[in-house]
Amino acid sequence: TSDRNEAFNALCNGIELDGKVLLEEFLFGEEASVLVVMDESGYVCLPASQDHKRLLDGDNGPNTGGMGAYAPAPIYTPAVEQRTISEIIEPMHHFLRNQDVPYRGCLYVGLMIDENGAPFVVEFNVRFGDPETQVTLPLISSDLGELLMSCANGKISECDYSISSYSSATIVLSSEGYPSNSITGRVINGTEIRI
């Protein structure tokens, strides 16, 4: 928040709950999401995407799970990609590979990329992100099932895969009241649009 009183009240409420508050540096920049399919043998980075979380046009309204996305994300340049791999993905892969139970699956890496092209981790999730997956998976030119089976069997390093040079976009249609009090069971009209 940019409201000092709101921030102060949140701080006081946190202290009252359990006496602990975690303060983090505010990150300025542009977000990007990278889906990494990995096992102990290696990993595959899918094209970076960017979702837009605000409910209303013009980046207004409350945050949502994502009202739309596109890939590839222009902010994720080859230089940013290289830094992300060497500074974030490689160390995380090394860490996970050396655990007693090696990780096999999708690692969602939420990034903030600053004005100098430095990537910072905002979040990790062990799942495919939504709506990012809707724009990323269509860009895989090879067999997705083969890629995922290779990962499940610990042989992703042996899997041949290719990524399309196309772009992809999605728009989310939501029910009235979303994201706080969605009205369910209604039909969302207007999905007959063809491009």
Regions of interest found by a model, annotated:
Residues 85-107, 125-195:
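Active-site "cap" helix and flanking loop/linker of ATP-utilizing ligase/carboxylase catalytic domains
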Residues 1-134:
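Internal nucleotide-binding/catalytic subdomain
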